[in-house]
Amino acid sequence: VINPGDESMLDAFYDYMLALDSEEEDMVFLIELPFSSRTDFSKDVVGYIAQQVEYWNNSKKPEDIVFERVDWIADYKSEEAENDASVAVANFNKLTESLVKGTDMKCSFVFNLKNTYDYDGCREWFEKALALPFHKQMVWGISDIKDYEQFGKLMAKHSNDAVSIYPPIDLDGAMEQLAEQAANEDKSD
C-alpha cells in the first residue's frame, strides 16, 4: 500500500525487482494488466506470464547471466467451472513448483492493476483465488493506494493469509541521496 503520488516510485521498485543485476534471489513476475472480467482474467494473466516465459526462453542473454530454460506450458483447460480464478492459480502453482522446488526461494506474482475500472469484479476474482490452495512457496502481491484502497476489506477478511505492507517510500530523501551520490562521483573523477 503506497501513498498517493508515489506510483512512480512503485514502478521504479518493480523495475529494480525485475532487473537482471538485482540481488533479488526470489523469482518475481510482474503482471501489468488491468482487470478485464471475472471470466477472462485468469486466461489473460496466464497468457501474460506464458509470454514472459517465452521471452525468457528465447531471448539472448548476457554471458554472465545463468540461463535455465523454463519448462512450463500454460494449461487453459485446468479451469474449475465454479471458480473463475482456478486457471490462474493452477498454472501459477505449477510454474512455482517448476521454478523453486527444492529451494527456499519464493515465486512471487505481483499484480499491477493500473487502469482497472471494475474493482468489484476484481475483488471477487481475488476472493475466488484465495479460496483455492496456493503452493507453499508462491506469493501474490497487489499494489494499492493508501486512503483509496481497493483491497483493504479483502486483506482484512484474509488476515491469516494476507498482509498489507506500507513501504517507507521517501521521494525527497531518495532525490537527496541521488544528488549526494552524483556529487561524490564528480569529486572522484
Annotate the PLM regions.
Residues C107-F126, L130-P168:
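Sensor-1/coupling segment of RecA-like P-loop NTPase cores
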Residues N160-L178, A182:
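Conserved AAA+ ATPase "SRH/arginine-finger" region at the nucleotide-binding site
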Residues N91-L99, F126-L132:
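Alpha-helical bundle protein-protein interaction modules that mediate dimerization/oligomerization
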Residues V1-L95, G102:
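Extended, compositionally biased accessory segments flanking or bridging domains
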Residues L99-C107:
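Short basic/glycine-enriched coil/helix segment immediately N-terminal to the Walker B
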Residues V66-S78, K106, R123, P133-H135, ...:
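Intrinsically disordered, low-complexity segments enriched in charged and polar residues
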Residues A183-D189:
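Extended amphipathic alpha-helical coiled-coil/heptad-repeat regions
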